[in-house]
Each structure stands twice: as structure tokens, then as C-alpha cells.
């Protein structure tokens, strides 16, 4: 029987090993039965999370160690999901700061740590992946201390304990050359260093809703830490917003806590514990869930606003309905309502009259994840080019989101990368050596200039560079920026692309289609190296003769089509273009498919 509770969050950059470390903590602490089959990457519950190796939605888990229940919250490691991070930190008594022993301190680490320090958390520093051949643990420790200083950590926070670890091998040690036996030193340090918060158990029940899950059986499930009193099944409760206004009222139908990664029903939730409750259908994240006698809301951390938007409509291409099952604006609306309820980082507005939806999010990845999920669910969509969301200050000055970009690369590529960032109105903030012929560049640049830049960076560094981006602040608008220089190669008619035609057109530019791909008028089938759009015929086969048959068309050698992510394709769009997304395909297209109508639109736009 546990009699104490510790709530701890893990702060780490993408792919610094936090999910693997949590897996081994659970296994070594006995959170699973001996005969239980345990999947790898336990905390990455979503399909996309396991594929990409990133945490998208924060989720709690629990382990028992020496009569203490340790609730562990695995926080997102990508800047686009910072809305999750901010809420999760409010549930924590302490934090594990996990840093790769070779890569060192990275932007996402800095971002989340700054928020944790502002909330008064005192992190335990774990320098992970000590089994790497290029580990530089001592240097990384110095960098970490400098980071704490730069983030205005207080004296107690600067006096952080340090462990060296390998999450994959399942050990942690206070000494760099210690015995490296197991993870017990980390579990013991959590108990000794992280102090449980003091809560008033005698007061009426109250908790802040920090996470929200949709459950087909229970309905809306709210996750939070009980800050006072106890929660009992079947008691009357209500939800009040940050202004103290009642949002909902009802019965607490079910209450759960986490054992391992599973939800276990309980009758009573104690102050200090992280629980899941059901029974209120209108309550939302940042609402206070409480006893009917409570009228004072719990303060919630403000959430940073979205920085980018896209417009989504039904698929209007000639191929609509051939690959997907969810085709109507009503189905899109219902899906976006569901997303906005579960993910406060996403908002949307409906444009009356044309059945289009303006969806706003924190950045490229957040919007790409949503589109990828909808695609896998059977939706067919038409998506506009991304737009940056601007602000104005009190004096009326136009402001735009600025990001901090950290790049690690070979020295030979640095001049090309600096030149590419200058064209995107980036400002070089720092440049330093990180090893033999290695450089680290840090830029501040407008978000609008960075759409799809990751693929460009990887091309410039021949796949050897590492780039990381994080929201920095809103800054003064940097002026107009040059768009895509390449003209579009546009299909002339509907049908199937032919190898012979593609082969002869390859000299005119990069082709996006291969033999037998379906095409239609207005579809962008390639890019020209020159400015200006061009309508081409990708269906023109070789003329037949007595000596040749049509089958010889397919013997030509075609350049393989470049594989691009949704984010890359969105970044390529000009203002008069769109991206068709279906479960099986993504196709670049002109917003207006008919060439005559396009010309009329261009003339009217020029006249205006």
C-alpha cells in the first residue's frame, strides 16, 4: 500500500531517449507482472508517435517504489505541442531533465525547461545515452549549468543533482565511471529530491483540468491533479472557467488513476494524486472541476497562441471520391470539432457559404499531424497554402512570429546554409565550433520563411546536418519575402500519365508523376527551373509503326519521383495553388483548374 505520492515530468528534446527510459523504469520497478508481454515504446501510444519517435500528446503513467507512487508525465518534445507542455507542468512536483550525452542542450530542452523553472520546479539532470561512442558528458554538464544560468534559475535550482545514464541499457549512476547496475539510483533520487506538494485534504474537492481525452464509452474524460480535498465516485461536481463562471454540473460517474500505463477504477482520489474523471460533458481544459461549494477557480498557465493557419475544404478535384470514404463538409466539421475539443493547440473557424474551414495551430508539424491523421481516417481534402498569423502591438506595428533555429553541421556546408537563411531574412545570432570541422549555427528568422526549410537544409548538408526550431517571440514584420521561383508544369487533360511523355518532359524540369499515375487538367505534375507556369501533355505516347508497339514506351528510364511529406508539399504552394490529400495520394494542383478561368482570375487580380 503506497502512502506517498510524487508527480514528476520528463523534459527532453526529441529523440533524447525519454520514452525508452520510462519503459525501463516501469519494467525494473515491477510495474508489470512477470508473465506480462510488454511492448517497446510504451508511452508512445499513437501510431504516428511510434513512427516518428516523438511524443505528441502528454500522457501520465505510474510506478510504485518503496511505498511511494510516482506519477510520471511524458511531455511532448516538439515546439508545436508546447500547449500540452504548459498544462502538464502544472501537475508536477518535480522534473527530470534528460539530455543526450553527445548532442547536449537543444532548443526544445531550453523551451520546456524555461517554463518549468518559472513554475518553481527543481529538476534532476540526467545525462543520457552514455553508451554513445561520441559522448561528451563533462562538456554537456557545463552546457547544462550555463543553460540554467541563462534562464535565470534561482540558487536552489542551480544546485541540481546529476545522474549519468543509459535508458536503453537500463542503468543510472551518480558517477561517470560507476557500477552501472540498474535504475535504482534514479528512483531513489526522485524520492529524496522531489518534495510532495502540501495540499489541504479537509477542504472541498477541486482540481484543474489539464488534459482531455474523448472516450467512446465514458464520454469526455478529464485528467488533472487534485489540489484539495478528495474526489469520490457519484458525488455532485461542477466545472467553472477561469472567470469563476459555471460551465457544467453533474455527477462524478467514474474516477481512475494510473497503474503503469493503464487506467484503474478507484472509489476515492486523494489530494496530490493525478486522476481521470468522467461525468461532465461540457468541461474543458483549464476549467476547475470541483465540489458544488467551491467558487474560486484554480489559476491556469496561459497558453501561447497559434502561429499558422490553413484553409481546408472538401476535395474538388476530378478524382474526388475514388480513394476516400469521408467526403463531405459535415464530416470535416465534425472531425475538426473533435480535434479542437481534444487539442487546445488547434482552433478552427468555419467560413459561411463556401463550406471551408480555417484551421490554426502552433506550427507546421501540428497541422501536418492533423492532416495525416485525417488522411488515415479516410478523408479527402483540399488544403490551401499555410498562412502566418500576424499581430499588432499597442502602437499599431505589425508583428510576426520569430523562431530560433539551431543547426549542427559540417563546416564545409556552413556558408551555403548561412546564405539560404539570409534569403529567408534570418539573422545569425551565434556561431561556434562543436568538434573537429563541426559548427553550430543559431538564427532568429520569421516563421513564414521556414516553411518546408527542413528538407532544403538536409539537401544543403547532404543529409548530415541536424536542424531544430523553436518559437522565440513575436518581432517586427521583416517585409515581403520572395516566394517559389519555379514555374508549375500543369497537366493538360484528364487520364493516365505515359512514360514516353514523362521521359521527354524531364528535361524541362522535375516531374512529380510517373507512368500510369492519374492526372487531370490543372494538376501540377512538375516544376520548371524557370519562372512562369507551363501547360504540358503527360499523356502523349509514341506514335505506333509497323515495327514498334506501344509496349516499348515503357522501356524508357524515368527519374524516380521525389517523396515529399505533407509539410514539404504545403511549403511549395503559391497563393493560387492547393494540395489535394486523399488516403492514397497527395497531389499539387491549381486552385482554379480550368485554364481559361485561371487567366480571368489573374487579369481581375492584376486589375485590382
List where the protein language model places each region:
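Structural and coupling elements of P-loop NTPases
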Residues: 1-608
